[in-house]
Amino acid sequence: MSVFSQLAESSKQNPFSLPVRSGNCASAVSAPGQVEFGSGKYYAYCALGGVLSCGITHTAIVPLDLVKCRIQVNPEKYTGIATGFRTTIAEEGARALVKGWAPTLLGYSAQGLGKFGFYEIFKNVYADMLGEENAYLYRTSLYLAASASAEFFADILLAPMEATKVRIQTSPGAPPTLRGCAPMIYKAEGLTGFYKGLPPLWMRQIPYTMMKFACFEKTVEALYQYVVPKPRAECSKAEQLVVTFVAGYIAGVFCAIVSHPADTVVSKLNQDSQATAGGILKKLGFAGVWKGLVPRIIMIGTLTALQWFIYDSVKVALNLPRPPPPEMPASLKAKLAAQQ
C-alpha cells in the first residue's frame, strides 16, 4: 500500500473534517506504540513540532534578520551584511542586534503551529478527496495546495507580531520592546496597524511555503531514489535526519528567491505607517526589491534546513509515524501494465 493510500485511510478518522469517512490506518504507518496517524493527538504533536521548529530558528537568527531588514529599508546607510552589523553595533551597541526577539519568538511560534499543523491536516484531507491514484499522480499539486492553505491561516497568526518586530527593528523612534511598541501601534493605528501588512505577507509567505513544502517533499523523494544508496526503511534515524537537513537547505534556497520581493515590501510597509504596497513597489523598481537577497538566501537556507531537521526530530522524539516517500499504488501499476 502506498503512502497516499495510508494517508487516505488515516484521514477517514480525521476529526477536523466531517466529510472524511471512518477507517483504520495501515500498520506500516502507525506501528505498535506509535501515536495513531491522522488522529487529533497526531496533529497536535505536529503543531507542537511546528511551534518549536519555527519559534526557535527564527529567534536564533534575529541579528541577521535585523540587518537584513535594515538593508531593505535603508540601503544607502546599510550597504551590506558586514556594514550593517558594524553600523548597528557602533551606533546602538551589541544589544541592539537582538531587538525584536520577543515578537519574533511569539509570532513565528504561532505561525509554525499553523504552518506545519494545518499542512498535515490539509495534505491528508486533500489526498482523501483525490483518491489513492490521483493523490500519487498529482502529489506535487497536492503539496502545493496543502501548504498554501496552511500558510493562509498561519499568516493571520503571524501578522501582528511581524508588524511589531519590523517597527522595533527599523524605526528609530519606536519603543525597543514588545510591551512598548505593540501598544504604540494600537494607539496610533488601531488593529489596522497590525494587519495592514497581511496582504503582502501572504504574497511573501504563501509562495515561500508552497516552495518550502513541495520542494522539500520532492527533494526527499529524489535523494532516496538517486543519491542515498539504500532504501529509507534501511536507513537509521540519524541518516534519515541528515537527508531531511539536506533537502531542507535545498528547499530554503528556492524559498528565499521566490519570496524576496514581497519580503522587501513587507519590511518597508511596516516601517512607514503611511506607506502602501503599490507606492513602495513603484518607488523601489525591479532592482530595489531584490536588495538584501544574499543575506536572505543564507538566512532562509539555514533556517529552512534547521526547521525541517527540528520538526522531523520532534516526530522521532514523540514517536510519531513518519511515512516514507510515496510509491505508485498497486492499482495504478496494474493499469499501466495493462496498457503496455
UniProtKB/Swiss-Prot annotation:
Q: Can you tell which superkingdom this protein's organism belongs to?
A: Eukaryota
Q: Which residues cross the membrane?
A: 47-67, 95-114, 141-161, 200-220, 241-261, 297-317
Q: Which SUPFAM superfamilies match?
A: Mitochondrial carrier
Pfam families named in the record: Mito_carr (PF00153)
What's a GO cellular component annotated to this UniProt protein? Answer: mitochondrial inner membrane
Q: How does it sit in the membrane?
A: Multi-pass membrane protein
Q: Where are the Solcar repeats?
A: 41-125, 138-222, 239-317
In its UniProt entry, what is this protein called? Phosphate carrier protein, mitochondrial
Which organism was this protein described from?
Caenorhabditis elegans
